[in-house]
Amino acid sequence: MRHYEIVFMVHPDQSEQVPGMIERYTAAITGAEGKIHRLEDWGRRQLAYPINKLHKAHYVLMNVEAPQEVIDELETTFRFNDAVIRSMVMRTKHAVTEASPMVKAKDERRERRDDFANETADDAEAGDSEEEEEE
């Protein structure tokens, strides 16, 4: 079986359907003896340019190992599903399991935000103790 990277974008009004879509697609892959190496739901993001007068879309990334028949079936499903506004299936040489740059950047921002919040809380506590000493 070959390795594939699949990215599909869902209409922003259909975002609540994304978990069900992911479940159906993963069931099709695993049902055909395939493996899912990475699954990332990037959520609703701004598009680089408008597609069908839309400026946002819900992104999903999957790295899978599956037979060609399943990939053909997925591509057909993407093509005839009105909620999917764009999709791309690429064959890769190896399984990709590490987090994508999108998720890494989000994690780094979260860590920086948490560090800043902790520093701010520590500074506030230090300021409160100094005021108590002055009184």
Curated annotation (Swiss-Prot):
Disulfide cysteine pairs (residue numbers): none
Keywords recorded for this protein, A-Z: Acetylation, Ribonucleoprotein, Ribosomal protein, RNA-binding, rRNA-binding
Function: Binds together with bS18 to 16S ribosomal RNA.
A single GO cellular-component term on record: cytosol
Family: Belongs to the bacterial ribosomal protein bS6 family.
One BP term from GO: cytoplasmic translation
Protein name: Small ribosomal subunit protein bS6
GO molecular-function terms, A-Z: mRNA 5'-UTR binding; small ribosomal subunit rRNA binding; structural constituent of ribosome
Post-translational modification as stated in the protein's UniProt record: 5 different forms of the protein, varying only in the number of C-terminal glutamate residues, were isolated. The sequence shown is form bS6-6, which is the longest. The first two Glu are encoded by the rpsF gene, the other Glu are added post-translationally by the RimK enzyme.
Modified residues annotated as N6-acetyllysine in this record: K93
Pfam families assigned: Ribosomal_S6
SUPFAM superfamilies: Ribosomal protein S6
Record's compositionally biased regions (Basic and acidic residues): 104-116
PANTHER family: MITOCHONDRIAL 28S RIBOSOMAL PROTEIN S6 (PTHR21011), SMALL RIBOSOMAL SUBUNIT PROTEIN BS6M (PTHR21011:SF1)
Subunit structure and binding partners: Part of the 30S ribosomal subunit. Interacts weakly with uL2 in one of the 3.5 A resolved structures.
NCBIfam families for this protein: S6 (TIGR00166)
Annotated segments matching region Disordered: 98-135
Acidic residues composition-biased segments: 120-135
